[in-house]
């Protein structure tokens, strides 16, 4: 296993340097010899400091400094597209690529953010409150990118099957 950002991992699979990568689904189609298996869908939420009152996500977003999820990441691009589609102008405080750091800043009252509700954050920290985006909710797909099965070794095929089976159990 090696850590890395989604684009780097995708490039390594495409180059044949690694067999499988767990990544955020990119906003573009894969080449014909690459396959995608969705493992989870994570809804985006507006997170605010616990003491901030109100349930209207649009009002909260316009009234408070915005901590932006990095636009260089696939998830951050989704947030950026959402804001543009909604014709929303935010008071940007900073831009970060680390979700945990974003949550910590919100927890400390620095501002608000739109982030995916990941498995790590099934429950938000005590000082953070999540506000649903209602019918505007969007998701990011987390999954596996790999080469077509005929290009994989038997142990890798077996691993892929086990991961897919486990993901099906949880969904």
Which residue stretches match the model-derived regions?
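Conserved functional loop/turn residues at catalytic and ligand-binding sites
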Residues: 12, 16-17, 38, 65, ...
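Flexible hinge/capping segments at coil-to-helix
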Residues: 33-71
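Short beta-strand->loop
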Residues: 35-45, 117, 126-139
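Ligand-binding cleft/hinge of the Venus flytrap
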Residues: 17, 76-89
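Short acidic active-site motifs
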Residues: 8-9, 56, 100-102
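A ligand-binding cleft/hinge motif common to bilobed small-molecule-binding domains
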Residues: 22-32, 99-129
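A late-sequence structural motif
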Residues: 131-171
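Central regulatory/effector-binding core of bacterial HTH transcription factors
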Residues: 1-29, 95-96
């Amino acid at each position: 296993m090696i850590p890395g950002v989604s684009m780097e991992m995708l490039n390594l699979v495409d180059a044949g340097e690694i067999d499988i990568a767990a990544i955020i689904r990119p906003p573009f189609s894969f080449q014909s010899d690459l396959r995608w298996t969705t493992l989870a869908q994570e809804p985006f939420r507006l997170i605010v400091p616990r003491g901030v009152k109100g349930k209207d996500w649009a009002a909260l977003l316009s009234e408070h400094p915005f901590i932006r999820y990095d636009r260089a990441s696939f998830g951050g691009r989704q947030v950026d597209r959402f804001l543009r589609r909604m014709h929303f102008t935010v008071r940007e405080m900073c831009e970060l690529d680390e979700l945990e750091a974003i949550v910590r800043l919100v927890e400390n009252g620095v501002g608000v953010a739109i982030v995916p509700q990941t498995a790590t954050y099934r429950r938000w920290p005590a000082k953070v409150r999540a506000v649903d985006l209602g019918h505007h909710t969007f998701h990011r797909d987390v999954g596996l990118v790999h080469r077509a099965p005929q290009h994989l070794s038997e142990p890798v095929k077996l691993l892929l099957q086990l991961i897919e089976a486990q993901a099906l159990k949880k969904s």
